[in-house]
UniProtKB/Swiss-Prot annotation:
Family: Belongs to the splicing factor SR family.
Disorder this protein is connected to according to its UniProt record: Developmental delay, dysmorphic facies, and brain anomalies: An autosomal dominant disorder characterized by global developmental delay with intellectual disability and speech delay, epilepsy, hypotonia, short stature, microcephaly, intermittent exotropia, and non-specific facial dysmorphism. Brain imaging shows a thin corpus callosum and/or delayed myelination.
Annotated SMART domains: RRM
Localization per record: Nucleus
Positions of modified residues (Phosphoserine): S2, S79, S294
InterPro entries on file: Nucleotide-bd_a/b_plait_sf, RBD_domain_sf, RRM_dom, U2AF_lg
Region of interest: Necessary and sufficient to stimulate pre-mRNAs 3'-end cleavage in a CFIm complex-dependent manner: 17-47
Stated name of the protein: Splicing factor U2AF 65 kDa subunit
CDD domains: RRM1_U2AF65, RRM2_U2AF65, RRM3_U2AF65
UniProt keyword list: Acetylation, Disease variant, Hydroxylation, Intellectual disability, Isopeptide bond, mRNA processing, mRNA splicing, Nucleus, Phosphoprotein, Repeat, Repressor, RNA-binding, Spliceosome, Ubl conjugation
Location of N6-acetyllysine modifications: K70
Main location (coarse class): nucleus
Name of encoding gene: U2AF2
Length: 475
C-alpha cells in the first residue's frame, strides 16, 4: 500500500470519529434542552400555584369570615355564626291547631270541662324573653268535637243522594244567614237508604246547633226529622238549642222552656195535621211533636208544642184545657208544671183518699187531677226511644240510671222497660215502669220526677194499675 493510500485511510477514520463525536454531542444537547424545558415548565406550574394561593388568601382577607376556619397559634378555630333571630308568633287570637272551627268560648268551655289540659298550650318564656307555644297534645284535635258537629236526619226522601242532601242544607244555611264563614258549612253526608236516615257533619259546633232550626223542614215532600246523635255530649256552657227561628218551619223537637205545653187526652185516631189544626187556632206553632207508638205509628194520645208568640200560651191553656174531644177530655198545661206545683200528699194513711192535685196556670180556681189514682207502680214516659233499647249495654245503663234515681224516693221493688222485637208489636215499648214498695214512695217519685229531664227530654208520669203491671199488660 502506497503512502498516499495510507494517508487517505487515516483521514477517513478521523472523519468517522469526528462524526461520531458530533452525533453524541447533538444527542446530549437535545436531552439537556428537553430537561431544561421540563424544569422550566415545573417552575411555571409552581409559580401559577403560588399565584392562585396568594389570590385566594387575598380574597379571604378582603371579606369578613362568617364560617370556615382561620389559622391562629397553629390551630384551627370555628368562627361564630351570625344568623337572624326567628320571629316567634305570639298566637294572639290565633286558634290552636285542630280547633280552627270552634269559637274561643267553646274552647274555654272544653278546657274548663277538662277536655283540654289547662297547661297544654300555655306559652313558655325563653331566656331571651320570647313566648314560645309548645307542640299541642296529640289527643287534641277536631275529633274531640266531631260528635258535637254531627246531626241525625230522619224521614229523608227515598233514593236521595248524598250530594243532593249536602247541596240542600248548604243552600238553606246560606239563605237563613246561619253560616259563620265563606264556603260550605256541611262537610260530609252519610246516608243509610235501608233505614231512611242520614248523618250530616258540619265544620263548626255553632253551625251544627243552628242547623237544628231546620227540624221539620220540607224536602222533596218529606218533613225531615233532625236530632242529635246518640253519642252526643253537650259542651259545658254552650247552648244545645238553636238561637234562631226559621219562619214557616215547625220543628218536631220541642225544647224545654217555660212556654212548652203538654197536651194530654188526645183521641188516638187524630193525626199530626188534625192536632196542629186544633192548636193553631190560637196562633202559629214554633214546634210540635205528637208522640206515637214506634211499632204501630199510632198516636199515644199526648203531644208537646210551643207557640211562635209566647203571649198566646196562657190563652191556649185556658181555651183547650178541659175541652171535650169525642169521649175524652183534654189536659193542657205547661210541661214543667208538675215538678213545681205538685203537692205531696201525706200522711200515708190518707193516700188512697187524697189524689195528687196541681194548680194549672191560666185556669180560674180550677184543679185537675194529675196522674190518676195513686198506686205503687209509676209509669215514666217521654224518656227513651225504642231504638235506644236495642243495644244490651245501653239498655242496662238506662235501667241502672232509672233505678238509682228512683231509689232516692223510696225502695224500688222492680223495674220493667219493654224492648222492641222485630215484627212484633210490643206493648208499652218506649215506656218505663217502676214498682215501689209503697204508694207513698211512688207519690214522692212522681212529684220529684215529673218535668225532670232525661236524655234532654221532659219526663211525663202517670200511675199504673198494679194488677196490669204484674200481668205485663202494658197497654
Amino acid at each position: 500500500m502506497s503512502d498516499f493510500d495510507e494517508f487517505e485511510r487515516q483521514l477517513n477514520e478521523n472523519k468517522q470519529e469526528r462524526d461520531k463525536e458530533n452525533r453524541h454531542r447533538k444527542r446530549s444537547h437535545s436531552r439537556s434542552r428537553s430537561r431544561d424545558r421540563k424544569r422550566r415548565s415545573r417552575s411555571r406550574d409552581r409559580r401559577n400555584r403560588d399565584q392562585r394561593s396568594a389570590s385566594r388568601d387575598r380574597r379571604r382577607r378582603s371579606k369578613p369570615l362568617t364560617r370556615g376556619a382561620k389559622e391562629e397559634h397553629g390551630g384551627l378555630i370555628r368562627s361564630p355564626r351570625h344568623e337572624k333571630k326567628k320571629k316567634v308568633r305570639k298566637y294572639w287570637d290565633v286558634p290552636p291547631p285542630g280547633f280552627e272551627h270552634i269559637t274561643p268560648m267553646q274552647y274555654k268551655a272544653m278546657q274548663a270541662a277538662g277536655q283540654i289540659p289547662a297547661t297544654a298550650l300555655l306559652p313558655t318564656m325563653t331566656p331571651d324573653g320570647l313566648a314560645v307555644t309548645p307542640t299541642p297534645v296529640p289527643v287534641v284535635g277536631s275529633q274531640m268535637t266531631r260528635q258535637a258537629r254531627r246531626l241525625y236526619v230522619g224521614n229523608i226522601p227515598f233514593g236521595i243522594t248524598e250530594e243532593a242532601m249536602m247541596d240542600f242544607f248548604n243552600a238553606q244555611m246560606r239563605l237563613g244567614g246561619l253560616t259563620q264563614a265563606p264556603g260550605n258549612p256541611v262537610l260530609a253526608v252519610q246516608i243509610n237508604q235501608d233505614k231512611n236516615f242520614a248523618f250530616l257533619e258540619f265544620r263548626s259546633v255553632d253551625e251544627t246547633t243552628q242547623a237544628m232550626a231546620f227540624d221539620g223542614i220540607i224536602f222533596q215532600g218529606q218533613s225531615l226529622k233532625i236530632r242529635r246523635p246518640h253519642d252526643y255530649q253537650p259542651l259545658p256552657g254552650m247552648s244545645e238549642n238553636p238561637s234562631v227561628y226559621v219562619p214557616g218551619v215547625v220543628s218536631t223537637v220541642v225544647p224545654d222552656s217555660a212556654h212548652k205545653l203538654f197536651i194530654g187526652g188526645l183521641p188516638n185516631y187524630l193525626n199530626d195535621d188534625q192536632v196542629k189544626e186544633l192548636l193553631t187556632s190560637f196562633g202559629p206553632l214554633k214546634a210540635f211533636n205528637l208522640v206515637k207508638d214506634s211499632a204501630t205509628g199510632l198516636s199515644k194520645g199526648y203531644a208537646f208544642c210551643e207557640y211562635v208568640d209566647i203571649n198566646v200560651t196562657d190563652q191556649a191553656i185556658a181555651g183547650l184545657n178541659g175541652m171535650q174531644l169525642g169521649d175524652k177530655k183534654l189536659l193542657v198545661q205547661r210541661a214543667s208544671v208538675g215538678a213545681k206545683n205538685a203537692t205531696l200528699v201525706s200522711p200515708p194513711s190518707t193516700i188512697n183518699q187524697t189524689p195528687v192535685t196541681l194548680q194549672v196556670p191560666g185556669l180560674m180556681s180550677s184543679q185537675v187531677q194529675m196522674g190518676g189514682h195513686p198506686t205503687e207502680v209509676l209509669c215514666l214516659m217521654n224518656m227513651v226511644l225504642p231504638e235506644e233499647l236495642l243495644d244490651d249495654e245501653e239498655y242496662e245503663e238506662i235501667v241502672e240510671d232509672v233505678r238509682d234515681e228512683c231509689s232516692k224516693y223510696g225502695l224500688v221493688k222492680s223495674i220493667e222497660i219493654p224492648r222492641p222485637v222485630d215484627g212484633v208489636e210490643v206493648p208499652g215499648c218506649g215506656k218505663i215502669f217502676v214498682e215501689f214498695t209503697s204508694v207513698f214512695d211512688c207519690q214522692k217519685a212522681m212529684q220529684g220526677l215529673t218535668g225532670r229531664k232525661f236524655a234532654n227530654r221532659v219526663v211525663v208520669t202517670k200511675y199504673c194499675d198494679p194488677d196490669s203491671y204484674h200481668r205485663r199488660d202494658f197497654w
